[in-house]
Amino acid sequence: MHVLRTHLAGDLGKETAGQTVTLTGWVSRRRDHGGVIFIDLRDSSGLVQVVFRENDVAEQAHHLRSEFCIKVTGEVEARPEGSENPNLASGAIEVNVTDLEILNEAAPLPFQIDDVSQGGEVGEETRLKYRYLDLRRPNQGAALRLRSQANKAARNVLDSHDFVEIETPTLTRSTPEGARDFLVPARLKPGSWYALPQSPQLFKQLLMVAGMERYYQIARCYRDEDFRADRQPEFTQLDIEMSFVDQDDVIALAEEIVSSLWKLIGYEIPTPIPRMTYADAMRLYGSDKPDLRFDIKIVECTDFFKNTTFRVFQNEYVGAVVMDGGASQPRRQLDAWQEWAKQRGAKGLAYILVGENGELTGPVSKNITDEERAGIAAHVGAKPGDCIFFAAGETKSSRALLGAARNEIAKKLDLIKEGDWAFTWVVDAPLFEPSSDATASGDVALGHSKWTAVHHAFTSPKPEWLDSFDENPGEATAYAYDIVCNGNEIGGGSIRIHRRDVQERVFKVMGITEDEAREKFGFLLDAFAFGAPPHGGIAFGWDRIVSLLGGFSSIRDVIAFPKSGGGVDPLTDAPAPIPLEQRRETGVDFKPKKKTDESAV
């Protein structure tokens, strides 16, 4: 239904020639050709060229500037032969304007908004400060429309399987889930605080106890994390939970959803999507989210060098990756690799160059034995002209360095082609990890022991570990699954714990006392006592998925009003101080009374 206009710009074509139309929109570009004025008029559907030839209306059009909001009436005409624009949907026609109304003028722009200038030269702070202008750019507006299409596609799949869309609270109590909470003061209960949810995890499990069986929600989530590249303090996930299912059931549904999303951009995902274990992902790719668009694998060399005299390789782990044709790199490039490794916390990146005649050169080749020199190229699959990069030391960090090196090699060799997609599931991750590893990576280690949950505290052990996970926490595997696309984790889930005794044992491994468990998670433990069904689910990182679908380099491009670095909103200048009166009213400075006896608060 159109009130001020009869058509959208994108609706006009040769079939509308001869019709009188009324359009509304913004002046995208203005060109003056000998008294005839051409305007590219933009609305939400696209662009159309409108022409001002008549004296009065042309005189009025002389006052138009970029981003004036206008209304025009005129006749649709075929463009003169040779002046068609094949790059424009409406490029075969133009509108000969007979009436012009300026709905609103525009001040001088902080940056240009047109089809040619798409934002690369404009600083991000400026773009976000004037986000309402930035979103007028075709690419930016298209990102939000793509997001809406993705929402619809996912809902269609879930609705076809009888899922129920349910909203869960955004004001709840603080229940640690692996990051810091955003807290909201409770004005009516001074000294008490709500927390914004890091995820709907506990509520969706309670919905399974409630018998809803199939739930989903496009949920807003909040995590008060130290700023990391391309993270947002508030983000969106497609949250799903199902009762009476196993891992295969959840994965099958997830693949149906992902397939429907990639069909939006014309790509058919081959299903079933391959699976690999977490152990294989770390061993072969040095990452639990491997990019499989190129076939470079890490080769284990620990056993090969088990009797080495080279002290650097006398370590718990030695591994290698091969750079095809890398022996031809100049010395400055090999030195640059060392700086690259040091920036990642390593001492360097050892290497061997395999000459065209098979002769080995480079620092490592001088320090290994003749037997090792004779066999290393064959062991790692290197041929004449290749470069072998090594990492040695602690297993996890060495593999991570080699994993990063394989990604860097792929970039330098241009192995990743536009339009390539590679999906995999990573399954059988550890149930627990050392708390020190979690904190070192910037996460919050839930609990007070040397072990914390890898995913979250509500992930079930795999069936074979159900009776013994607390006897050997470091070896226990989780009934969990992550989906990876082009080296990005786009979703993760697990089969959940549904028995109170198992949940209490997990808390115990993590050093959460009975009293603390009762205080923070008592409502969940109580619910498990009332016939909680087996259940599992998955959550998709919606911002990341839409950015991949649209080919955007940052999730900020697919969020209507994102935060910049450090969680700051340049548009509204949030976060901001609040007045003293508001501080008093909300009770943020309330100080609990000191305890005078056991019952005092």
From Swiss-Prot:
Important for tRNA non-discrimination (site feature) positions: 33, 82
Residues noted as binding ATP in the record, renumbered to the chain: 223-225, 232, 489, 541-544
Annotated S-S bridges: none
Location of the region described as Aspartate in the Swiss-Prot/TrEMBL record: 201-204
Subunit and partners: Homodimer.
GO terms (BP aspect): aspartyl-tRNA aminoacylation
Enzyme class: ligase
Pfam families on file: GAD, tRNA-synt_2, tRNA_anti-codon
NCBIfam families per the UniProt record, alphabetical: aspS_bact (TIGR00459), PRK00476.1 (NF001750)
Protein name according to UniProt: Aspartate--tRNA(Asp/Asn) ligase
Family of this protein: Belongs to the class-II aminoacyl-tRNA synthetase family. Type 1 subfamily.
Residues binding L-aspartate: 177, 223, 455, 496
